[in-house]
UniProtKB/Swiss-Prot annotation:
Intracellular or extracellular location(s): Nucleus
Ranges in a coiled coil: none
Protein's name in the database: Homeobox protein Hox-D13a
SMART domains found in the cross-reference section: HOX
InterPro entries: AP_axis_regulatory_Homeobox, HD, Homeobox_CS, Homeodomain-like_sf
SUPFAM superfamilies assigned to the protein according to its UniProt record, in alphabetical order: Homeodomain-like (SSF46689)
Species: Danio rerio (Zebrafish)
DNA-binding residues: 191-250
Superkingdom to which the source organism belongs: Eukaryota
Role of this protein: Sequence-specific transcription factor which is part of a developmental regulatory system that provides cells with specific positional identities on the anterior-posterior axis.
Record-linked Gene3D superfamilies: Homeodomain-like
CDD domains associated with the record: homeodomain (cd00086)
Transport found in the keyword field: no
Length: 256
């Protein structure tokens, strides 16, 4: 079995394992860059992602997978210029083993985990906006990571974000059309009832019964309440207040 046939078989069996690396598998020869080519790869680093079929021969083949911390880079390995980036720009000189190891550790994965670290929102999450929209860069301020939320850029930025006329006004709580009588009635319903003075006829009947007995009975209370158009509670309260008033006047108590 040659290398090209083995590559096609790998792509057909494991299409998800190759992804964007399928373009490298058309030539039939192994294609790996200096950074992607490890010197020794163990089975534990590849097994979480896919397994090899049983009919693989000794021919050459190309595959794409994620490597874990189990790869090893020799001490004397030297990477050519342009393979790795340093501070956002291509390096003009070869990169030694120490610098490459520090960069590779930043993009390493947990051993035995099939996915990478969760993405943390930071400054790089903000998309690039035109200079005319952002204004002068000297007046821009740095954004912190705390409370950062991804902005939905699917909508057009030129559309109006806020319109005062679209806002619905809240209904007025106080209506000026209410009359003073309605306001007074509502206040009396919520709080204490308005005091209504007794009429002369009511006071005459109450005083006559009080002169007869200072403690009214149940039958007399019902009779006076029905004759004076008062409630039994009002009659009882009037007798209580009348007795308190007599106690405050000593001369009346002596005569009694």
């Amino acid at each position: 079995m040659d290398g090209g046939g083995l590559d096609e078989e790998f792509i057909n069996v494991y299409p998800s394992a190759f992804g964007t690396h399928s373009s490298r598998c058309t030539s039939g020869a192994p294609v790996l860059s200096a950074v992607d080519r490890p010197t020794s790869v163990c089975n534990e680093s590849i097994s979480p992602y896919f397994s090899f079929p049983s009919n693989i021969g000794s021919g050459s083949f190309t595959f794409g997978c994620h490597l874990e911390n189990s790869y090893k880079v020799p001490q004397n390995a030297v990477f050519p210029p342009g393979v790795a980036k340093q501070n956002g720009q291509f390096a003009n000189k070869p990169v030694d083993h120490g610098e490459a190891s520090s960069w590779l550790k930043e993009f390493a994965f947990y051993q035995g985990c099939a996915r990478s670290y969760p993405r943390i929102p930071a400054f790089i999450d903000l998309p690039v906006v035109q200079r005319a929209m952002m204004g002068d860069l000297r007046h821009e301020t740095c954004l912190t990571m705390e409370g950062h939320q991804h902005w939905d850029w699917s909508n057009n930025c030129s559309s109006q974000l806020y319109c005062f006329q679209d806002q619905t006004r809240s209904p007025h709580i106080w209506k000026p059309s209410l009359t003073e009588e309605a306001a007074a009635a509502s206040f009396c319903q919520r709080g204490r009832k308005k005091r209504v003075p007794y009429t002369k006829f009511q006071l005459k009947e109450l005083e006559r019964e009080y002169n007869t007995t200072k403690f009214i009975t149940k039958e007399n209370r019902r009779r006076i309440a029905s004759s004076t158009n008062l409630s039994e509670r009002q009659v009882t309260i009037w007798f209580q207040n009348r007795r308190v008033k007599d106690k405050k006047r000593p001369d009346v108590c002596i005569k009694c």
